[in-house]
């Protein structure tokens, strides 16, 4: 039976809607009363796992799920061994460098050498500043990253931005974009190559559904 790993949070509703368009209904996950983390679709053709977004590629890489939906930001940060299949064209956001609006920094290159940058995306942040040949200390933070510059713990942050409202309300401005992110369809590499459970048919239908939506 096909198993799909779905992310909790903002991508879930659109992920379920997309799967419904190809005949796989996991809408029970949207019921506020449910506590189930694994459910079959209404026709018994597949099942879905509801997991943290960061864990989607782990379940896919280790073969517990043949397909998964996850943000490109997670794939860039984690670099999992999975097959990248389709840009699903929803869940748009961007990975940005931000600083206090009251600071003099208007470009990452304005930041002082060996300054501090707070981020939950440690690998992406390190890779970006390495590409600029600017040595900085990456400070791992996993909640309210905006507090880094506000409290003076860091000169800047690297974080995911959707509307930018949270940053504006906390007196921060974006000074650079590392990359843009959307939801992606990924697959377990061996299952994809061997077409386990007619996986290629499901993928083809999902590709077509995305094209129709665009």
From Swiss-Prot:
CDD domains documented for this protein: PBP2_HisGs (cd13595)
Record-level GO cellular component terms: cytoplasm
Top-rank taxon, per record: Bacteria
GO biological process: L-histidine biosynthetic process
Domain notes: Lacks the C-terminal regulatory region which is replaced by HisZ.
Record family assignment: Belongs to the ATP phosphoribosyltransferase family. Short subfamily.
Physiological role: Catalyzes the condensation of ATP and 5-phosphoribose 1-diphosphate to form N'-(5'-phosphoribosyl)-ATP (PR-ATP). Has a crucial role in the pathway because the rate of histidine biosynthesis seems to be controlled primarily by regulation of HisG enzymatic activity.
Record protein name field: ATP phosphoribosyltransferase
Protein's organism: Nostoc punctiforme (strain ATCC 29133 / PCC 73102)
Highest classification ranks of the organism: Bacteria, Bacillati, Cyanobacteriota, Cyanophyceae, Nostocales
Underlying gene: hisG
